[in-house]
Amino acid sequence: MNSCDFRVFLQEFGTTVHLSLPGSVSEKERLLLKLLMQGMSVTEISQYRNRSAKTISHQKKQLFEKLGIQSDITFWRDIFFQYNPEIISATGSNSHRYINDNHYHHIVTPEAISLALENHEFKPWIQPVFCAQTGVLTGCEVLVRWEHPQTGIIPPDQFIPLAESSGLIVIMTRQLMKQTADILMPVKHLLPDNFHIGINVSAGCFLAAGFEKECLNLVNKLGNDKIKLVLELTERNPIPVTPEARAIFDSLHQHNITFALDDFGTGYATYRYLQAFPVDFIKIDKSFVQMASVDEISGHIVDNIVELARKPGLSIVAEGVETQEQADLMIGKGVHFLQGYLYSPPVPGNKFISEWVMKAGG
């Protein structure tokens, strides 16, 4: 019987579940299974997919019948017994330490973040980015993970908002940039030319004294003729559109430092950025990428984003690519770069070097 690979990241546990599903399971059904495994209810899925709860319930019933799942109560048991999933932690190990999201607020405080910064517990985890046409490694996005000595990996959505509101994000980003340079420095000769290194930047970081110097330090250490630093701007903590901010943009651009609009299409700020600042990349939000093959409206949104980016000559990255169908669709729509769990989750720096840089350079 034909089969298809299926991967889903369960953020609550910090693990990726890998299943081999029957080949008869469609792209739409795999998306539904992913949302169910991530804990979404029928009501939540109906809102997410812009479909009625009755329609989602019917699709869920058909999916359960196809996969031999008896009920919600036996959902996980039936999956584990029938499909023998491979469960891999983000570090690649088989040992896990779990913590319930409800308990994070007892751990994540400004004092705890400050102490963790002193102890260098925040580490860069790196996700590769590939050329859509050739499949060649062309860059990466650097993300931050809190490697807590007692509780294990704490996901960024649990500490980034507090780090931003407390101002500690400036020190965190500075550490992240330095660690990234240290990780890539020994293998910079193996990096392809114009290797893109994306780092998320909040308003606090962008406007902080010395930020431009930190960017130039990273670029100069790895080689301005070798790498291209891409500062990724988000909706969450937008940079104010002021003459002062524009002057910083222009100064960084003169040093060959580029800018990307992250999670594009999800809010007003990214469109305001596009109007006000000289950006170079648009990163299509994963919600549109993952829905484009099963939802006509999402597909049209992707088409509009691609057309919007094409006129000023911006490069386009599709984030959150999880299936080959999604990758093929994005390539067909004219996207330039692909990033997502189909290729690799974010991994620790040493694993990124061994799994991707050494292989690409060899």
Curated annotation (Swiss-Prot):
Reaction equations catalysed: 3',3'-c-di-GMP + H2O = 5'-phosphoguanylyl(3'->5')guanosine + H(+)
Keyword Nuclease assigned: no
Cofactor: Mg(2+); Mn(2+)
Effect of substituting residue 299 to S: Increases catalytic activity
Record keywords: c-di-GMP, DNA-binding, Hydrolase, Magnesium, Manganese, Metal-binding, Transcription, Transcription regulation
Task performed by this protein: Acts both as an enzyme and as a c-di-GMP sensor to couple transcriptional activity to the c-di-GMP status of the cell. Phosphodiesterase (PDE) that catalyzes the hydrolysis of cyclic-di-GMP (c-di-GMP) to 5'-pGpG. Also acts as a transcription factor to control its own expression.
Protein name stated in the entry: Cyclic di-GMP phosphodiesterase PdeL
Naturally occurring in which organism (per UniProt): Escherichia coli (strain K12)
